[in-house]
């Protein structure tokens, strides 16, 4: 098991012999206070949805950062993101612009991630919901 990098008390885990992940980590390890961010969708503080999959993902990520800021945390503290998308084809068709939007909001912070398709979300106009788990160092 190789431990890659160390940002703000978090270490990315990489099993020996596995290909390097691109845009995510296979695992993360950290010690400190854990912050759980409930599912964030692509609307702003006034309840207005961003346009399209890429816009909603960028807004959901900004919403995650707003919650983390309330705990004194930032994107470098995120250990895990779980993405729920209503249209996997739209997600796959937009991987490059999604990657750009992700880096614009989160920088080069790539935690453990999972993406799954769901039939629908509670808010009918929502195309994505993202949960986050962060660790603030001791």
Task: List where the protein language model places each region.
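N-terminal presequence-like segments and the immediate start of the first folded domain
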Residues: 1-79, 85-138
